[in-house]
């Protein structure tokens, strides 16, 4: 990408740092996850969790949600100004699961937000450590991406359920900063913009006055984030039009939906990071590992290494398959919900199946579920190989526009062929090339038509043995040409409801 000089690496975004060299980045990312680990250990002490209970992913998620809620300034302010019955704005909590007499019990815990903030800052050398909070948000977002489908949200904004592979990060909170923006898919950004434009259409004052000025700045910033994800001049030119529109309305919505469709072939660049549950970092810190000294990267071998020797448990409902639960969490840990299943299976070393075939519901347990019948089992989060995470859309030829995989947003920088039926996608582009952006639309359609399915993405890139930490010997897998594996085929997952 041409603008590489101005871009910070996404480790730098993650740690809020200015330009740093590789060693400094590794150290500051290490400091960030080490802080999460120290916080987790302290919370386990506060809650008097046994070693086993501290390794339970459901407890980890509750503790993560508590600290995110404690630092959610906007919501805290809102809660204080709009007191609702039975909700103390100064407290946060959630379900903690304990093992009693061979059974799992649920216990609701409540803490002062102030107290949680104190523990978090103490674990992070007295700083607010926003980067660590964003890291936890991205882990929750990756878990949602693997667990739920967003068909309803897509349809509500006038998009097509087939665009689900563009929806990475769609549940990330607004406050997730630059690191959050980097991992959002094209569809997610389009959806946020469409929602904004629709509000402007329905509410005359949305763009007016002092508030409207702030809204406008946010709108243009989101347009620029989305523009930066596109890799072709024509797509970017349409984004300039959308951004500069005096009074954004239906024409802009049309343009955005057109761009989202085009991104099915001309993929945008979306970052991928392996963000692990807090308990995993806690286990490592407790065993004496010094993240800051050793350094850590979210996009290299480190997360794979960490998962090779961490034992994490999960509660299992009576008719769930523990192996499937493991697959769900493995995909979330590596941000691989939108990756080609052929690639994921090869790296993991066991077959990764589409979501429609999983006998497992989400990881979190609802408060009305019966604990009597709950069991727990070990999550198998190890892998056979490791691979470098990518931020490119996997288009075959970066110099000029070319094809990426249709129902896939690549996570791993690993060579794969592009088995796709271009005709099925091109059908979505019949007609409608009129209006201001007609020449750009025509250009985009032409590029998509000339995309060749026989090309390969990430040419020559391979996976590595777990002993090969310097990535010296790439093993380039060969895949069955015929079927691209999308995780979402035959989907029957629950919808994401906030």
From Swiss-Prot:
Region called Disordered, residue ranges: 1-21, 79-98
Stored Pfam families: Flu_NP
Database matches in InterPro entries: Flu_NP (IPR002141)
Keyword Chaperone in annotation: no
Domain of life: Viruses
Gene Ontology MF terms: RNA binding; structural molecule activity
Biased composition regions of type Basic and acidic residues, renumbered to the chain: 79-91
Reported function: Encapsidates the negative strand viral RNA, protecting it from nucleases. The encapsidated genomic RNA is termed the ribonucleoprotein (RNP) and serves as template for transcription and replication. The RNP needs to be localized in the host nucleus to start an infectious cycle, but is too large to diffuse through the nuclear pore complex. NP comprises at least 2 nuclear localization signals that are responsible for the active RNP import into the nucleus through cellular importin alpha/beta pathway.
Subunit structure: Homomultimerizes to form the nucleocapsid. May bind host exportin-1/XPO1. Binds to viral genomic RNA. Protein-RNA contacts are mediated by a combination of electrostatic interactions between positively charged residues and the phosphate backbone and planar interactions between aromatic side chains and bases.
Annotated HAMAP family: INFV_NCAP
Name this polypeptide is given: Nucleoprotein
Species: Influenza A virus (strain A/Duck/Germany/1949 H10N7)
Organism ancestry: Viruses, Riboviria, Orthornavirae, Negarnaviricota, Polyploviricotina
């Amino acid at each position: 990408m041409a603008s590489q000089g101005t871009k910070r690496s996404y480790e730098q975004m993650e740690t809020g740092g200015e330009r740093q060299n590789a060693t400094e980045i590794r150290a500051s990312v290490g400091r960030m996850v080490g802080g999460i680990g120290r916080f987790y250990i302290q919370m386990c002490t506060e809650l008097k969790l046994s070693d086993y209970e501290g390794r339970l992913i459901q407890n980890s998620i509750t503790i993560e949600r508590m600290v995110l809620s404690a630092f959610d300034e906007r919501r805290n302010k809102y809660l204080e100004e709009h007191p609702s019955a039975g909700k103390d704005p100064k407290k946060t909590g959630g379900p903690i699961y304990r093992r009693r007499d061979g059974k799992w019990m649920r216990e609701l815990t409540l803490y002062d937000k102030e107290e949680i903030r104190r523990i978090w800052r103490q674990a992070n050398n007295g700083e607010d450590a926003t980067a660590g909070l964003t890291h936890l948000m991205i882990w929750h977002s990756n878990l949602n991406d693997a667990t739920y489908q967003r068909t309803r949200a897509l349809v509500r904004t006038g998009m097509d359920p087939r665009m689900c592979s563009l929806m990475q990060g769609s549940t990330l909170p607004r406050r997730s900063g630059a690191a959050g923006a980097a991992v959002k898919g094209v569809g997610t950004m389009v959806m946020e913009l469409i929602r904004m434009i629709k509000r402007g259409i329905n509410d005359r004052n949305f763009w007016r006055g002092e508030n409207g000025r702030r809204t406008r700045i946010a709108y243009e910033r989101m347009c620029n984030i989305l523009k930066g994800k596109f890799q072709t001049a024509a797509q970017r030119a349409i984004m300039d039009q959308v951004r500069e529109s005096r009074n954004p309305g239906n024409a802009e919505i049309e343009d955005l939906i057109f761009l989202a469709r085009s991104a099915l072939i001309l993929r945008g660049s979306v970052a991928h990071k392996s963000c692990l549950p807090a308990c995993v970092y806690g286990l490592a810190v407790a065993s004496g590992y010094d993240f800051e000294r050793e350094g850590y990267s979210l996009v290299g071998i480190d997360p794979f290494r960490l998962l090779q020797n961490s034992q994490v448990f999960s509660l299992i409902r009576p008719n769930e398959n523990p192996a499937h639960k493991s697959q769900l969490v493995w995909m979330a840990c590596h941000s691989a919900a939108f990756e080609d299943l052929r690639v994921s299976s090869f790296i993991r070393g066991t077959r990764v199946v589409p979501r429609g075939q999983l006998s497992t519901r989400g990881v979190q347990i609802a408060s009305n579920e019966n604990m009597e019948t709950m069991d727990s089992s070990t999550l198998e989060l190890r892998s056979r190989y490791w691979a470098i995470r990518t931020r490119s859309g996997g288009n075959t030829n970066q110099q000029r526009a070319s094809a990426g995989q249709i129902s896939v947003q690549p996570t791993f920088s690993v060579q794969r062929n592009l088995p796709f039926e271009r005709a099925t996608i091109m059908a979505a582009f019949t007609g409608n090339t009129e209006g201001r952006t007609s020449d750009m639309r025509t250009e985009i359609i032409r590029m998509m038509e000339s995309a060749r399915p026989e090309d390969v993405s990430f040419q020559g890139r391979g996976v590595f043995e777990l002993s090969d930490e310097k990535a010296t010997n790439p093993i380039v897998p060969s895949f069955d040409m015929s079927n691209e594996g999308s995780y979402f085929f035959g989907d029957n997952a629950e919808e994401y409801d906030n």
